[in-house]
């Protein structure tokens, strides 16, 4: 029998061609429909984007700064955390020591120096404590020449090494609550020595350092039995033999806070009202002074009005902590001497403030300084009231705090949420 291999039949010329054409036509139609749908989707997406852009009705993220024409908030609003550390003590931590109306200044090696203030017995202090941030221990150093409270303090650095050479302590009030213009240097190795006296009263004023000079600003001056906030500014250089009067602040400020950052001087908050109307007296303004031109510029205000706060310079920003605020009674009247938990960070390049984690213990009239570990706050007064009259908030004696808290903030991307300026968050 003859063997023939199997041969695959050829497709019919008619049937195979029709199928091929039908498949090609169907593929082309599907491709065209896909193209049309894709083009429509792109068109609609662009139209939606343009409409949303025009209406600014949606938030979006940017890196580094808020887009021009928009308002914004840090994606890390409320960042940071506060932690209790060793309370203020004069005997190695055995007994806590409440104190208010003091100043804290960072020395070399990160240690913080606490000057003067008022204790729980109402005594105005000449005390100097050194806080070791590593061992968390307080050491009693040589006292100041004179007791003082509600004064200014700032560091002068060495022109050759950049290290703290001396700390200037100036102004404030004495043991009788009288305004004083005396000043002294505090050498970290040898203790105090006389410094040139101020030209003006600066009770409850604020001091900032640029390293090569310190600036004493604002505060109160006494006229008879009345006190008036002042706008005076004085400068003492590292080699100066007298305070030099500089351009006044844009407006008077008592109970202000100040810090030096990258060669500029900043003054935040404070109080100014001749009638002591607390509904308008507390301020949230921020003023920047340029030593190179002897001029002041008003910058973006804080989000919260307050006085007797602290302003601390970080690496590139400023941290405004705590302070005294107005508070309404049930009948609608306002009182002061009420401490706040507010914490805000200022970004000079953006001219913008952002909320940070609130401090655990509300306080005002406290000391604050930055170390290598974080931002420290020491002592201060809480919400004050007369124990015999719950509606009288003018009584603070004996309520001074020994509390010491430290603020830590992890580094994070500089991400900002942008939104329509008409919507406030």
Regions found by a protein language model. Name each.
Residues 13-48:
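Single-pass membrane-anchoring alpha-helices
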Residues 1-15:
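Intrinsically disordered cytoplasmic terminal tails of membrane proteins
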Residues 38-425:
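Kelch-like beta-propeller repeat domains
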């Amino acid at each position: 029998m003859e063997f023939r291999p199997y041969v695959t039949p050829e497709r019919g010329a008619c049937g195979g061609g029709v199928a091929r054409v039908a498949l090609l036509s169907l593929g082309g139609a599907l491709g065209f429909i896909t193209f049309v749908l894709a083009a429509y989707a792109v068109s609609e997406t662009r139209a939606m984007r343009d409409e949303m852009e025009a209406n600014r009705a949606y938030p979006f993220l940017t890196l580094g700064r808020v887009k021009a024409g928009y308002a914004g908030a840090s994606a890390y609003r409320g960042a940071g955390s506060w932690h209790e550390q060793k309370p203020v003590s004069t005997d190695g931590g055995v007994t806590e020591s409440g104190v208010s109306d003091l100043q804290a200044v960072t020395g070399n090696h990160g240690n913080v120096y606490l000057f003067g203030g008022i204790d729980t017995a109402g005594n105005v202090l000449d005390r100097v404590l050194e806080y070791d941030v590593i061992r968390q221990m307080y050491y009693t150093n040589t006292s100041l020449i004179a007791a003082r409270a509600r004064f200014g303090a700032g560091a002068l650095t060495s022109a050759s090494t950049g290290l703290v050479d001396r700390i200037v302590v100036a102004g404030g009030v004495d043991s009788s609550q009288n305004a004083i213009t005396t000043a002294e240097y505090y050498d970290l190795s040898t203790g105090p020595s006389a410094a040139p006296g101020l030209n003006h009263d600066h009770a409850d004023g604020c001091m900032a350092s640029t390293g090569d000079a310190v600036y004493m600003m604002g505060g109160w001056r006494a006229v008879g039995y009345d006190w008036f906030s002042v706008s005076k500014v004085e400068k003492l250089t590292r080699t100066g033999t007298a305070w030099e009067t500089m351009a006044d602040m844009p407006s008077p400020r008592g109970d202000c806070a100040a810090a030096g950052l990258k060669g500029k001087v900043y003054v935040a908050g404070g109080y100014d009202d001749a009638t002591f109307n607390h509904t308008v007296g507390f301020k949230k303004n921020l003023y920047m002074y340029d030593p190179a031109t002897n001029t002041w510029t008003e910058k973006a205000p804080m989000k919260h009005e307050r006085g007797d706060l602290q302003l601390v310079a970080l690496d590139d920003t400023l941290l405004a902590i705590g302070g005294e605020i107005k508070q309404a009674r049930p009948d609608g009247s306002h009182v002061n001497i009420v401490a706040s938990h507010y914490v805000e960070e200022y970004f000079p390049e953006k001219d913008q403030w952002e909320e940070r984690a609130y401090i655990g213990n509300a306080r005002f009239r406290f000391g604050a300084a930055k170390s290598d570990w974080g931002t420290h706050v020491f002592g201060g007064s809480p919400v004050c009231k007369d124990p015999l009259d719950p509606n009288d908030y003018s009584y603070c004696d004996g309520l001074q705090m020994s509390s010491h808290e430290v603020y830590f903030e992890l580094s994070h991307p500089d991400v900002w949420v942008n939104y329509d300026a008409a919507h406030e968050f």
